[in-house]
A protein has these predicted regions:
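Generic alpha-helix detector with strongest preference for long hydrophobic helices that associate
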Residues: 31, 82, 96, 111-116, ...
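A short glycine-/small-residue-rich loop at the edge of a beta-strand within enzyme catalytic domains
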Residues: 88, 92, 122, 152
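Generic alpha-helix signal with a bias toward terminal, lower-confidence helices
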Residues: 62, 86, 113-119, 136-139, ...
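C-terminal accessory module of base-excision DNA glycosylases/AP lyases that mediates lesion recognition
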Residues: 1-57, 124-187
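Catalytic DNA-binding helix-loop module of base-excision-repair DNA glycosylases/AP lyases
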Residues: 96-137
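Helix-hairpin-helix/helix-loop-helix acidic hairpins
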Residues: 59-107
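Homeobox/homeodomain signature
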Residues: 40, 91-97, 116-117, 165, ...
């Protein structure tokens, strides 16, 4: 069983910074999107970027047809509805945010958590099977990744991640990046 530690998280997050090709643009969006969403100063492409990032971070390991289908579904949403929702995220609790985000076409709980991460990276982090599986294998989550991922499961994951970030004295983005690297399939 893998054991998570502060040193492992820091090391793997640094590996992420050195090796993940999307890290620069991801950093830029983590820096600018929270304010843009909160202020309502964003366009459709800014919102669409989050959906594209969720799938494209797999670097071709996510089925292309499914990725394209989900991206197209998201593009079909009424932008005024998306704009209003993203502008109101900061005032919502996690249940309401997930409920409203998953009501959008092309957005399931994992994609909704990407929106939460980019709206408030100090409070939320994205989840998918890969990240969840690392925590399960390390004994930090008792159950394997549910399929489909429910809002209640995300809250369990988020609570555990917040506790680990506190324990390891790191932010949630650092923890996410470590989990992603620890779940990277062998090349």
């Amino acid at each position: 069983m893998m054991e998570l530690s502060r040193s492992l998280v820091v090391e793997e997050a640094e590996s992420y910074r050195e090796s993940e090709p999307l890290v620069t643009v991801e950093d830029q969006h983590l820096d600018i999107l929270p304010g843009m969403f909160a202020d309502g100063e964003f366009g459709h492409r800014d919102a669409e970027w989050v959906v594209r990032w969720y799938f494209r971070r797999f670097l071709g390991r996510y089925p292309d047809a499914e990725r394209r289908r989900r991206e197209e579904q998201f593009r079909e949403n009424d932008f005024d509805r998306v704009h209003t929702l993203l502008g109101e995220l900061a005032g919502m609790d996690v249940d309401e945010a997930l409920d409203r985000l998953t009501a959008l076409d092309g957005v399931d709980v994992p994609v909704a958590t990407a929106f939460l991460q980019f709206a408030d990276p100090d409070s939320y982090l994205v989840v998918g099977e890969r990240e969840w599986s690392v925590l399960h294998e390390a004994g930090e989550l008792s159950e394997p990744s549910p399929d489909p991922l429910s809002p209640a499961a995300y809250e369990t994951y988020l609570s555990r991640c917040r506790a680990l970030a506190d324990e390891f004295d790191c932010d949630l983005v650092t923890l996410y990046r470590a989990l992603w690297r620890l779940s990277t399939p062998d090349e």
